[in-house]
């Protein structure tokens, strides 16, 4: 199945490469080898790569906390974690919860530096106002979820699936709240600490390595919680909802954006299923849920639903959330970005079989964009939950 998904999208990369003239290719390869070799042999860069304190960029890419010799085995195990169900949809339902957690952890080891290089330190989409740039749109997107969670100065707030922490730092800075972010991935904690120290926000934001379905916090600890495109990585959604419910104080709000299929998704439409399969594996999700399933699970856990809607369709004057993916494709970055990484793998700057993972991730650029245009998927369906007040 993985090879089929890759074959759908990789041929255009090959065709684009054929259009490059020999002298352009030779110049590019020579420059890349020279620069790559110079930077690779720089002691300071090697130290930064090892400690997770590099400031991003193509030559700061690593495989996270994975040892170079283990990359091949873990990339293969990541791909093999997925199987096709009877309805044609790709899931990890056949593996144990522990294996699913490990699969997601491996995904973040492999993808974190790529996200920081190609995207930014906020690992999410946003709809851009006409007057704003991408960075401003990201902040606005984060601030909306903070408002929906009713975050106030001095509150203790949980960031559920913090990544490298930029949304948590933004919300802490703007609200005056104390934000604790949890991520399953040790390398992301390193990166979050690096960015937090650099921003001098240690007193406002703290990253913690923990499984968001089994956190180390006491019952009724937090005044609010938020999640941005994170709970779609939970092996079972009810597990993370139950845990957030447990650690929230009575009356507290939990607001989140989640990746879900929309009413237009037709499980009998072969193209729809292909797009969702590429989206699932390309983003390290155990499966793809519908917005209705998310609503039902939250209610079963005990939350009160205050609102749910697709933020991607909230305003007609905003640029679509897949705009940056469109830019990647139109500018050629979706082709020359992966090609550059493959070159670095070829010369030994990155683990050789890291390229297998790049093919999977690159395919999702095209699938996610098309799914957005078809109106069958959104990464920003809003759910605003409240833990009921205790009754006397």
Curated annotation (Swiss-Prot):
Coiled coil: none annotated. The chain crosses the membrane at residues 20-42. It is found in: Microsome membrane. It is an enzyme of class 2 (transferase). InterPro entries: Erg6_SMT_methyltransf, Methyltransf_11, MeTrfase_SMT, SAM-dependent_MTases_sf, Sterol_MeTrfase_C. One of its GO terms (cellular component) is endoplasmic reticulum. This is Sterol methyltransferase-like 3. It comes from Botryococcus braunii. The gene is SMT-3.
